[in-house]
C-alpha cells in the first residue's frame, strides 16, 4: 500500500472519532466572549490524546495594539485563553502554523444540539469553524497513527474572538509566534486560496439644521443630505469595481467589490427635520486597495461631489472591522506545495482569491508569513440557521492537510 492509500485509510478509520468530536464541540455555546468552556474542554481533550496542548491567556494589553478590533460590550479576556498545540519536529524541516477559531456567532438553542444524519453534521459552528478544528486534529492524528514524524515543527492554534475581528489570532502573533508558513482554516468549499479580499466597516454622518417641518425652508434635513452622500458611495462602488476588473484570481461578475449601507438612522420626531443622519456599512475590496486608501478616496469624492452643506458638515471614517486584503504570490513554495497536495487528493484545483476576509490577513501582514486559507464546508451556510458540513469533506480536507505537511515539513527517515 502506498502512502496516499495508507493515509486515506488512516483518515477514514477515524471518521467516527472526528464526527463525535465535532458534535461535542458544537454543544458548547461559544459565542464571542463566552469561549472559556470550549477552550478548557479542548485543551483537556488534546492532553488526554497525548498531544502537547496548553492554554495561552490573552493579555489585556492587546486592546492597545494598533491592529486590535474594538468589540462591543467587551468584558476582558480572563478565562478565555487561546489553545496552542505544539508538535515538535525531528529537525531539519520547514515549520507551519495551522489556525482556526472556536468562537461562533449566536443562534437559537437548537443549533447547539448537534445532529448527525446521512454523513452530514448540523449545528452552529459545524463549518464555521469547529469543523475546521476537527480537520486539523484529524490530519495530525492520522499521521501519528501511521507512525509519521515530521521534521518541521507544527503549531496548531485554536483561537477566540475571530468573529469579532481576529483578536485571538492577533494576540498569538503579538506574542511572537511565527513559522515558515501559515494555513488558516475556514469554510472555503475545499478551495485553495492564497489571497483574500478585504473588508472594512464605515460610519458616515452628516449634521443638519433641525426645525419644525412647517418652517422647513429655514432648516436643513440631514436625511436629505444623507441621500446624496449615499449616492456618492454607490458611485464610488462602481468606480472601485471598474478599477478591480480583471484582477487575477477574482471574478468580474458577480464582483466581490461591494459598498454596502447596512444601517441608516435619522431624526427623532416625525414632524421635525432631522438634525443628524448616520449611515453605517461595509466596503469589500481586493488586494489592489488597502483600508487607508479606501478611506482617503471616499473622503476625496465627498469633498468633490457633495453639496456645499454636506462638504462642511459630513464626516466619513472607517470604524470597527478593518480586515486588510492580502495576496501570497501563487509561485511561493508554500502555495505550490499546498496546491500539489490538494490536487493529489481532490483532482485539478484552480488557485483563487477568497471572496471573504478572515484572520489570514494578520498572519500575512503582521506575521510576514506566506498564508493560505483552506477548509471544508460551504461559506454560504456559515452563520445560517441551516449551518452544516459533510463529514466526507472533513475527511478530504484532512487528507489534503496531512499530504501538505509531509511535503512541506518533510519526514524523518525519508530517503
Each model region followed by its residue ranges:
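Metal-dependent amide/peptide-bond hydrolase catalytic core
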Residues: 1-6, 48, 77, 203-415
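Acidic/His- and Gly-rich active-site-bordering loop/insert found
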Residues: 2-122, 150, 368, 378
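Short, P/G- and charge-enriched loop/turn segments at secondary-structure junctions
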Residues: 68-75, 190-191, 247-249
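Alpha-helical metal-binding/catalytic segments enriched in His/Glu/Asp
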Residues: 98, 117-164, 203-206, 216-237, ...
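Short glycine-enriched loops at secondary-structure junctions
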Residues: 101-105, 187-190, 198, 267, ...
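Acidic-glycine-rich active-site phosphate/pyrophosphate-binding loop
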Residues: 103-117, 194-205, 340, 372
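Acidic/histidine-rich catalytic neighborhood of metal-dependent amide-processing enzymes
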Residues: 129-201, 251, 409-415
Amino acid at each position: 500500500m502506498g502512502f496516499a492509500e495508507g493515509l486515506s485509510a488512516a483518515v477514514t478509520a477515524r471518521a467516527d472519532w472526528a464526527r463525535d468530536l465535532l458534535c461535542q464541540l458544537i454543544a458548547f455555546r461559544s459565542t464571542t466572549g463566552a469561549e472559556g468552556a470550549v477552550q478548557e474542554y479542548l485543551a483537556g481533550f488534546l492532553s488526554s490524546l497525548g498531544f502537547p496542548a496548553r492554554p495561552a491567556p490573552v493579555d489585556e494589553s492587546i486592546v492597545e495594539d494598533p491592529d486590535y478590533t474594538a468589540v462591543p460590550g467587551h468584558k476582558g479576556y480572563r478565562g478565555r485563553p487561546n489553545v496552542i498545540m505544539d508538535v515538535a519536529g525531528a529537525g531539519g524541516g520547514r515549520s507551519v502554523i495551522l489556525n482556526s477559531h472556536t468562537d461562533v456567532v449566536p443562534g437559537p438553542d437548537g443549533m447547539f444540539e448537534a445532529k448527525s444524519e446521512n454523513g452530514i453534521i448540523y449545528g452552529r459552528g459545524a463549518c464555521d469553524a469547529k469543523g475546521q478544528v476537527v480537520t486539523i486534529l484529524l490530519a495530525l492524528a492520522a499521521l501519528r497513527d501511521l507512525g509519521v514524524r515530521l521534521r518541521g515543527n507544527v503549531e496548531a492554534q485554536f483561537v477566540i474572538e475571530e468573529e469579532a475581528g481576529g483578536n485571538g489570532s492577533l494576540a498569538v502573533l503579538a506574542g511572537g509566534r511565527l513559522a515558515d508558513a501559515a494555513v488558516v482554516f475556514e469554510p472555503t468549499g475545499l478551495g485553495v486560496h492564497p489571497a483574500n479580499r478585504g473588508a472594512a466597516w464605515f460610519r458616515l454622518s452628516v449634521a443638519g439644521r433641525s426645525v419644525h417641518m412647517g418652517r422647513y425652508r429655514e432648516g436643513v434635513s440631514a436625511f436629505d443630505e444623507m441621500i446624496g452622500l449615499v449616492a456618492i458611495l454607490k458611485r464610488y462602488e462602481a468606480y472601485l469595481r471598474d478599477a478591480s476588473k480583471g484582477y487575477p484570481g477574482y471574478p468580474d461578475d458577480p464582483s466581490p467589490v461591494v459598498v454596502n449601507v447596512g444601517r441608516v438612522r435619522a431624526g427623532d420626531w416625525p414632524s421635525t427635520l432631522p438634525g443628524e443622519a448616520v449611515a453605517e456599512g461595509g466596503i469589500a475590496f481586493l488586494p489592489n486597495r488597502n483600508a487607508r486608501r479606501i478611506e482617503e478616496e471616499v473622503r476625496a469624492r465627498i469633498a468633490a461631489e457633495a453639496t456645499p452643506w454636506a462638504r462642511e458638515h459630513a464626516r466619513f471614517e472607517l470604524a470597527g472591522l478593518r480586515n486588510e486584503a492580502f495576496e501570497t504570490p501563487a509561485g511561493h513554495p508554500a502555495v505550490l506545495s499546498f496546491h500539489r497536495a490538494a490536487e493529489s487528493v481532490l483532482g485539478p484545483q484552480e488557485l483563487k482569491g477568497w471572496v471573504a476576509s478572515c484572520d489570514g490577513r494578520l498572519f500575512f501582514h503582521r506575521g510576514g508569513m506566506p498564508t493560505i486559507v483552506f477548509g471544508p464546508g460551504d461559506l454560504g451556510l456559515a452563520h445560517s440557521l441551516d449551518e452544516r458540513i459533510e463529514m466526507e469533506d472533513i475527511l478530504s480536507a484532512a487528507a489534503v492537510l496531512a499530504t501538505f505537511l509531509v511535503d512541506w515539513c518533510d519526514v524523518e527517515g525519508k530517503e
